[in-house]
């Protein structure tokens, strides 16, 4: 039997990872191929490649299939090829990076079965037109929507209503979230009202579940809801009908290592290639997204009111220039501390957000101005009062707090900047 000439994208960091082999395989198959003295994985791009200009006797044969559980379909392969070109990343390596660990004996796949209760809510006068507008475009090919709704406006209930429409039509839904810790609240909500299996896909899911889910979703005949982070974008879902990206502005959708892609943008491309609608949701859309939709590159929907009788909190910006300086309270102001005390008197809770750890940003000699820096990173060492140490935020080097300046011997060392420990000290004294 004559072997086919295969074009394979191998898992290598080479700019041109497309290599020619002989063997029996089909487009989209995952195979093992020899490269030098190594055997590496790859994906078949063409099962009838041209061998013109090559000596067929010198063309090596593939070692065999890597797995029969996973096969990359044409639409998914088109997405990989677009990403490889757009982000300038080797195609074979891109595919391999997105795959789950290949297992020989995967366990049974875990999932949450929805209860399918009747909706206990009705969309309000602001949500209903948004839902109807998107609903009218659900089954008309590719469309792009931005749902710009203030916090508490009920975007989740619009999503849920859209899910039900798509799932009832026999198609599946992919719901993308930026962080793992957001999945539980959505599973609890969606599982009440949707009578379909709900699968999770993120880094806390076992390798066995990931591998099984890849094999399952490409053969789906029944609709499912998949909730996941950016890596779930590559799942080869057979009958996908809708993609929703919640909190589209979140930086966690950007991958900073290996292929540095933005999952939001890749999700839009995936929807375009599969000719299905996509909804981006946010209370604070990114500037590029907002500009794109406001300039007519998609359907722009707004929710400006909170659900029920709840109102938006009152925001007040305190100008420190008009406040009397109190060194004991710095960086807090008298007004801030007074507001905190009043809230506690009313038995209310208070959250103080501080985006710095430790007691101070750095130590400085009062006499000569010497700053204590990390010998490895040359960055300022942050002071932690509770442990009485200086610590580097990059390499995590730790050193006891010095008693004097190494340059001039002065023993008066000043704390500069502030962190959570200093704020805690101030509030405990008050």
Model segments located where?
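Accessory interdomain/linker segments of ATP-dependent helicases and helicase-like nucleic-acid enzymes
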Residues: 1-17, 343-346, 358, 366-371
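Accessory, non-ATPase domains that flank or precede helicase/AAA+ motor cores in DNA-metabolism machines
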Residues: 1-282, 289, 294-310
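Structural signal for conserved beta-strand scaffold positions within catalytic alpha/beta enzyme cores
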Residues: 46, 200-202, 280, 302, ...
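Hydrophobic alpha-helical scaffolding
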Residues: 70, 279-283, 326-329, 398, ...
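Glycine-rich phosphate-binding "P-loop"
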Residues: 118-119, 142-152, 252-253, 315-330, ...
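Short, flexible helix-loop junctions that flank or precede catalytic/ligand sites
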Residues: 158, 329-334, 339, 388-389, ...
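Conserved interdomain linker/interface between the two RecA-like ATPase lobes of SF2 helicase motors
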Residues: 270-273, 277-280, 286-366
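Cys/His-rich short segments
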Residues: 345-428
């Amino acid at each position: 039997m004559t072997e086919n000439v295969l074009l394979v994208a191998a898992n290598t960091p080479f700019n041109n990872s497309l290599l020619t082999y002989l063997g029996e395989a089909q487009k989209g198959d995952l195979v093992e191929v020899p490269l030098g003295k190594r055997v590496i994985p790859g994906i078949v791009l063409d099962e009838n490649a041209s061998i013109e200009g090559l000596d067929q006797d010198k063309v090596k044969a593939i070692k065999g299939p890597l797995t029969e559980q996973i096969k990359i379909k044409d639409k998914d392969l088109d997405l990989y090829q677009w990403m490889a070109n757009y982000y300038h990343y080797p195609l074979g390596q891109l595919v391999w990076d997105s795959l789950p660990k290949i297992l020989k004996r995967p366990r049974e796949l875990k999932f949450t079965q929805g209860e399918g209760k009747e909706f206990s809510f009705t969309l309000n006068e602001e949500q209903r037109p948004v839902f109807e507008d998107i609903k009218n475009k659900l089954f008309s090919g590719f469309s792009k929507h931005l749902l710009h709704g203030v916090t508490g406006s009920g975007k989740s209930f619009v999503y849920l209503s859209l899910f039900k429409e798509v799932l009832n039509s026999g198609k599946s839904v992919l719901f993308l979230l930026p962080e793992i810790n957001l999945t539980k609240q959505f599973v609890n909500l969606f599982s009440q009202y949707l009578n379909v299996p709900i699968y999770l896909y993120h880094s806390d899911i076992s390798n066995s579940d990931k591998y099984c889910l890849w094999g399952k979703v490409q053969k789906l005949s029944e609709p499912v809801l998949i909730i996941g982070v950016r890596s779930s974008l590559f799942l080869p879902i057979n009958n996908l009908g809708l993609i929703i990206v919640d909190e589209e502005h979140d930086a966690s959708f950007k991958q900073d290592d290996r292929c540095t892609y933005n999952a939001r943008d890749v999700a839009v491309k995936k929807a375009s290639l599969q000719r299905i609608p996509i909804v981006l949701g946010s209370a604070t859309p990114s500037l590029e997204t907002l500009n794109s939709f406001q300039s007519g590159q998609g359907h722009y929907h707004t929710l400006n009111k909170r659900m029920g009788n709840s109102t938006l909190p009152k925001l007040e910006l305190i100008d420190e220039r008009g406040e009397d300086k109190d060194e004991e309270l710095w960086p807090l102001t008298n007004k801030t501390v007074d507001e905190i005390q009043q809230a506690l008197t009313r038995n209310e809770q208070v959250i103080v957000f501080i985006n710095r750890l430790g007691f101070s940003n750095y130590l400085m000699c009062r006499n000569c101005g010497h700053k204590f820096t990390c010998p490895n990173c040359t960055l300022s060492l942050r002071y932690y009062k509770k442990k009485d140490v200086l610590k580097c935020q990059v390499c995590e080097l730790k050193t006891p707090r010095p008693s004097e300046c190494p340059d001039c011997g002065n023993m008066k060392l000043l704390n500069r900047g502030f962190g959570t420990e200093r704020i805690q000290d101030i509030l405990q004294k008050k």
